[in-house]
Amino acid sequence: YNGHLNMAYYNVLFDRAVDEVYELIGIGADYLKRAKHSTFTAEVHVRYVRELHANDPVRVTFQLLDFDSKRFHYFEQLFHATEGWVSATSENMTLHVDMAAKKVASFPDSVMRSLARMKAAHAQLPRPEAAGRRIAMPGR
């Protein structure tokens, strides 16, 4: 309503973009079925920078900031696809989970190699200015 994109749908767009990345690094839908492992989001920080309206074209970028054997930290930006401005950002910490045991588990070697290649490529990009921000009331 109000002619703009509701805040929940920003997260849907970010999540759909991550699904594409998961396929690239080998932890997509087939991986869940085959390996019985998945990912759970442990923390997310979304910033709503500029309003999108219904039917605005969008594009999402993904930047891997860091990873270890059981988790990865990434930053996404949602852009108006034709005008180029940033509408929202999303910073996430994601855990790799053994679905049978329901506990955090190590990535397989193939995924670790994919993450290492991606991090090396993304390390060439500038770190997003908004990465690592926190919510707080300014001191008075």
Model-inferred region functions:
Residues N2, N6, V58-V60, T94:
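Short beta-strand segments
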